[in-house]
């Protein structure tokens, strides 16, 4: 969702609460739970999963390895669920012509730096930089170059923009900010 007027441009950034993250967190949780149940049933010698008899899988070495994969998968799954619940990476970019200030806000991981808030004067913006990495899967990226601060990415690496869409976005933003576009 984006909102734009003559003086203010607000771009809402989607964080980790994406459909693909929910899908992979569920698949990883269920798969690792299955591995852990198979490893546990081979250790106990009982059928915790009725798909096949537990005597077919010896605990050493297959049961140990499956238990290890199950535990590792549960840790990775819990990490994914935590990033989804904390909505890491979400936030907004706000360009305010009236105040002459650019605000960039992102949610991070819990702790001292949970809120990432950057503020710049519009007059310090040197250019909007667009980089296109050629290859089998070309990925355009958009950056804002700030005097004395370097470049700040404005697009995520997992966003699937075509070069044409990225050019359009870069042109609109550069026009709004009244700065040049650099293409690399």
UniProtKB/Swiss-Prot annotation:
The family this protein is said to belong to: Belongs to the Ycf4 family.
PANTHER family cross-referenced by the UniProt entry: PHOTOSYSTEM I ASSEMBLY PROTEIN YCF4 (PTHR33288:SF4), PTHR33288
Annotated GO CC locations: chloroplast thylakoid membrane; photosystem I
Transmembrane portions of the chain: 22-42, 57-77
Membrane topology: Multi-pass membrane protein
UniProt-listed GO biological process terms: photosynthesis
Organism in which the protein naturally occurs: Ceratophyllum demersum (Rigid hornwort)
Domain of life, source organism: Eukaryota
Keywords, sorted A to Z: Chloroplast, Membrane, Photosynthesis, Plastid, Thylakoid, Transmembrane, Transmembrane helix
Places the protein is found: Plastid, Chloroplast thylakoid membrane
Alphabetized InterPro entries for the sequence: PSI_Ycf4_assembly
Protein name: Photosystem I assembly protein Ycf4
Functional description taken from the UniProt entry: Seems to be required for the assembly of the photosystem I complex.
């Amino acid at each position: 969702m984006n909102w734009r007027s003559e003086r203010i441009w607000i771009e809402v950034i989607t964080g980790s609460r994406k459909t693909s993250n929910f899908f992979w967190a569920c698949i990883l949780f269920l798969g690792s739970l299955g591995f852990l149940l198979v490893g546990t049933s081979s250790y106990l010698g009982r059928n915790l999963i009725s798909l096949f008899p537990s005597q077919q899988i010896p605990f050493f070495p297959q049961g140990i390895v499956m238990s290890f994969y199950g535990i590792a998968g549960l840790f990775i799954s819990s990490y994914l669920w935590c990033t989804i619940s904390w909505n890491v990476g979400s936030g907004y970019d706000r360009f305010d012509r009236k105040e002459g200030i650019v605000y960039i806000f992102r949610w991070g991981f819990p702790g001292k730096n949970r809120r990432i808030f950057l503020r710049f004067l519009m007059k310090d913006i040197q250019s909007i930089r667009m980089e296109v990495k050629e290859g089998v899967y070309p990925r355009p990226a958009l950056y804002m170059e700030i005097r004395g601060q370097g470049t700040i990415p404005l697009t995520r690496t997992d966003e699937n923009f075509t070069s044409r869409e990225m050019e359009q976005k870069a042109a609109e933003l550069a026009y709004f900010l009244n700065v040049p576009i650099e293409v690399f």
